[in-house]
């Protein structure tokens, strides 16, 4: 009798424990970003959510908050470190206070094209940067392309002297401030969500952005000219809170890491196509004149802005800059 009772208790306990496991709340990952869903980052966040919830049903729930709907670009880093959000994908200009080395991505005319950026990011030096902020509580999960930056303004920008005196919106980056000062323009820090209104009201006269940002934020409606300068890159590092990441069950962390790697490949594959598509949509809208620089004009811009490299060489490291330059040579 006691034997049967013990067996019954064991079975009941097993069912209870199983019920508790089944009823356990899923791990919630809040993924916050500041751009539209149509952009490479917006599409990447949605794909990450889809794949994670398919692969970890009931275990992990991913909530995506686009367009600064949860945190703006001035608050999202603090929110990540406080644990109020688990994944964000700030532009590479946003890490200045955590590591000076990531300023390398803001140096003007360092990379010839997005393929060179990709080669550097996949190099040992590029991958090392992903883990360079773990002592600050930040773990990098991957680089997502947004695209090469174009200059826009309400006057034609063909030569460096054309930018003189104009007010350009910049991210909070000392490198980008110096980039515009090099052509005697006036940099103005402004959050991404405020750029359209800033351009519309004349608080700023111009900006720098990839085609997808220009189109998705309708900047072409308030900018008469866009110069296809490809003078710099605006990419993102997808990051998480180190304590949160290390505290995840090992199997869950493994699935998330593998999924992020797959999504990164897809985002970076689609980014250039999306940018070119948005460029064409801007052309068809006929609200802005697209200016193509001659090789000689582009060389003038490069000559005017390249001295910025020397100003930040000590903080970034000459060897790291050389490694980035080497990525311009196709393998």
UniProtKB/Swiss-Prot annotation:
Q: Which UniProt keywords apply?
A: Periplasm, Signal, Transport
Tell me where it resides: Periplasm
Output the Gene Ontology cellular-component terms.
outer membrane-bounded periplasmic space
Q: Which residues constitute the signal peptide according to the record? A: 1-23
Name the source's superkingdom.
Bacteria
Q: What else is known?
A: The DctPQM carrier is more efficient than the DctA carrier for the utilization of succinate at micromolar concentrations, whereas DctA is the major transporter at millimolar concentrations.
Name by which UniProt lists this protein: C4-dicarboxylate-binding periplasmic protein DctP
């Amino acid at each position: 009798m006691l034997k049967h009772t013990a067996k019954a208790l064991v079975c009941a306990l097993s069912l209870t424990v199983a019920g508790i496991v089944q009823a356990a709340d899923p791990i919630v990952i809040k993924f916050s970003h500041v751009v539209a869903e149509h952009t490479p980052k917006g599409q990447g966040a949605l794909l990450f959510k889809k794949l994670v919830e398919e692969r970890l049903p009931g275990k992990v729930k991913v909530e995506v908050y686009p367009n600064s709907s949860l945190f703006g670009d001035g608050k999202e880093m603090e929110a990540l470190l406080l644990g109020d959000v688990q994944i964000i994908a700030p532009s590479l200009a946003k890490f200045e206070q955590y590591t000076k080395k990531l300023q390398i991505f803001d140096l003007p005319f360092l990379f010839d094209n997005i393929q060179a950026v990709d080669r550097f990011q996949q190099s040992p030096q590029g991958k090392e940067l992903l883990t360079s902020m773990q002592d600050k509580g930040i773990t990098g999960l991957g680089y997502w392309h947004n695209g090469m930056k174009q200059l826009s303004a309400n006057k034609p920008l063909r030569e460096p002297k054309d930018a003189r005196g104009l007010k350009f919106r910049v991210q909070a980056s000392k490198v980008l401030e110096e980039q515009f000062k090099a052509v005697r323009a006036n940099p103005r820090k402004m959050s991404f969500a405020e750029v359209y209104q800033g351009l519309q009201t004349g608080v700023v006269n111009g900006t720098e952005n990839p085609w997808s940002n220009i189109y998705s934020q309708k900047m072409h409606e308030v900018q008469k000219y866009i110069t296809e300068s490809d003078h710099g890159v605006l990419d993102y590092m997808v990051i998480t809170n180190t304590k949160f990441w290390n505290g995840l069950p090992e199997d869950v962390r493994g699935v998330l890491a593998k999924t992020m790697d797959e999504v990164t490949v897809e985002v970076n594959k689609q980014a250039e196509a999306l940018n070119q598509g948005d460029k064409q949509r801007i052309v068809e809208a006929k609200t802005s004149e697209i200016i193509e620089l001659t090789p000689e004009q582009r060389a003038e811009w490069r000559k005017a802005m390249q001295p910025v490299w020397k100003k930040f060489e000590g903080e970034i490291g000459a060897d790291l800059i050389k490694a980035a330059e080497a990525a311009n040579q196709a393998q």
